[in-house]
């Protein structure tokens, strides 16, 4: 028989909060698997020990933030509301059933004032990583690094053209020394390097967002146009634990921060990996040389030849490493003549040899009198990387990228709100990236904790 309840009776009930949160709830698992006591040690210097009004427990604040990142709750006002209505969230944050969650402005004011000039988010990430390492979740032998773009909280139409300082590239001094040495071997004078590119102090024009000036305009092929940040992430192959996070504006080339990334990885893990997997965006001679000097075997995606000109590309010429010469399609040898300021060796024949060649029109333009082929001074390192990548082991290591770094980024964007920046400025972007990586590593800790039983 159909029955409709027309009025609700008010009644008092005695409830035990512990019984209202299921034993298999994910937040219960997090509470068992992760030791959060380190938060007090991190925050102690930021609070007065014996004076002032009692503050909100910092562990409650950070547990609230972790709930927001775990469940993709982007707004702090929405987070406050969800915690007030969700018993499991309240239980995890250490609140009683009738306690109100700290106000959203409490979190934002703590961020702006108390936590502004320190790296609390990074330290939380570091501690979670240390717990992962203590549980044996980080192998450290094979790492993968890649970057992903994160849309800044900025309108792409609100922008202006500004002049910015140009920083000399990190590898210039090492490259210059090698170029000078090679020119000396050829009996040529070293280059004068008093230009702005080497001394610093040069400038260039860039499009800058008026809403978030620290973001960078992205205008690469195959990427969305607008203002973005780039997160450079490094993950371990064993359990897909994130071991490093590095944030830059999106107009910084992916290869530029690689020396800093390697230093950060070594500082966090205490060692460098044996292998490092990178996609084709890192396929250049400097990266291969950098990895080789650090004792790391690079496994880098190969870039296909994209030469579409009317004349022969470099790939039509075969390199002879024993004689350090190139051999053209007509079996003529191109010898090393000089090394350019940019670090490229130039190989060519005598002018009369090219002038009488039957393939001259297809080989080079009418304004030139001979074909010139260039080879970077660090090209040998890149070719050794390519040779290893084509081996059976190299192919297996590179193939794991989609299961590690690509999966890690997909998880962060789909489940934890990393597709968009939550706040303005690179400092807030770093906080978002570090806390997102921390909750992803917490999920690995939970999986490991329950796998052990």
Residue spans of the language-model regions?
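Hydrophobic alpha-helical membrane-insertion signals
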Residues: 1-28
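Anion-binding and metal-coordination hotspots
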Residues: 3-4, 72-85, 95-453
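Short, solvent-exposed coil/turn linker segments
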Residues: 16, 34-38, 94, 161, ...
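Short secondary-structure boundary/capping segments within folded domains
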Residues: 18-20, 53, 223
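Basic, short loop/linker segments at the boundary and entry of helix-turn-helix/winged-helix-like folds
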Residues: 23-66, 376-377, 381
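Short alpha-helix boundary/capping elements
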Residues: 38, 69-72, 87, 91
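Short glycine/serine/threonine-biased micro-segments
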Residues: 50, 92, 423
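N-terminal catalytic cores of NTP/NDP-binding nucleotidyl/phosphoryl-transfer enzymes
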Residues: 60-68, 74, 79
């Amino acid at each position: 028989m159909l029955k409709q309840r027309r009025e609700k009776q008010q009644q008092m009930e005695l409830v035990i909060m512990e019984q209202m949160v299921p034993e298999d709830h994910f937040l219960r698992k997090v509470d068992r698997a992760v030791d959060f006591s380190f938060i007090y040690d991190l925050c102690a210097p930021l609070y007065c020990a014996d004076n002032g009004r009692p503050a909100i427990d910092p562990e409650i604040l950070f547990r609230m933030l972790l709930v927001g990142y775990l469940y993709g709750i982007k707004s702090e006002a929405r987070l406050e509301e969800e915690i007030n209505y969700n018993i499991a969230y309240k239980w995890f944050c250490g609140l009683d059933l009738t306690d109100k969650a700290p106000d959203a402005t409490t979190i934002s004011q703590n961020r702006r004032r108390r936590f502004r000039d320190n790296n609390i988010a990074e330290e939380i990430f570091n501690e979670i990583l240390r717990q992962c390492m203590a549980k044996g979740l980080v192998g450290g032998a094979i790492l993968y690094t890649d970057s992903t773009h994160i849309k800044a909280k900025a309108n792409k139409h609100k922008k202006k053209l500004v002049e910015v300082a140009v920083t000399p590239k990190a590898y210039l001094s090492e490259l210059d020394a090698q170029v000078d040495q090679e020119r000396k071997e050829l009996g040529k004078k070293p280059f004068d390097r008093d230009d702005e590119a080497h001394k610093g102090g040069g400038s260039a024009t860039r499009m800058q967002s008026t809403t978030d000036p620290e973001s960078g305009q992205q205008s690469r092929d195959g990427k969305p146009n607008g203002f973005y940040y780039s997160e450079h992430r490094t993950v371990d192959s064993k359990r897909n634990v994130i071991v490093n996070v590095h944030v830059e504006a999106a107009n910084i080339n992916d290869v530029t921060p690689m020396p800093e990334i390697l230093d950060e990885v070594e500082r966090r893990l205490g060692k460098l990996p044996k292998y490092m997997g990178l996609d084709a965006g890192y396929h250049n001679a400097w990266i291969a040389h950098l990895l080789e000097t650090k004792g790391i075997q690079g496994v880098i995606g190969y870039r296909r030849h994209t030469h579409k000109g009317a004349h022969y590309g470099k790939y039509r010429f075969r390199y002879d490493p024993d004689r350090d010469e190139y051999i053209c399609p007509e079996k003529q040898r191109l010898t090393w003549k000089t090394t350019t300021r940019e670090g490229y060796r130039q190989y060519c024949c005598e002018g009369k040899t090219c002038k009488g060649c039957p393939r001259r029109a297809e080989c080079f333009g009418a304004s030139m009198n001979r074909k010139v082929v260039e080879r970077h001074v660090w090209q040998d390192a890149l070719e050794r990387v390519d040779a290893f990548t084509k081996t059976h082991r190299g192919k297996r290591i590179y193939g794991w990228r989609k299961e590690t770094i690509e999966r890690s980024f997909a998880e962060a964007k789909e489940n934890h709100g990393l597709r968009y920046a939550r706040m303005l400025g690179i400092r807030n972007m770093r906080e978002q990236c570090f806390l997102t990586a921390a909750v992803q590593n917490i999920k690995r800790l939970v999986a490991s904790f329950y796998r052990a039983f």
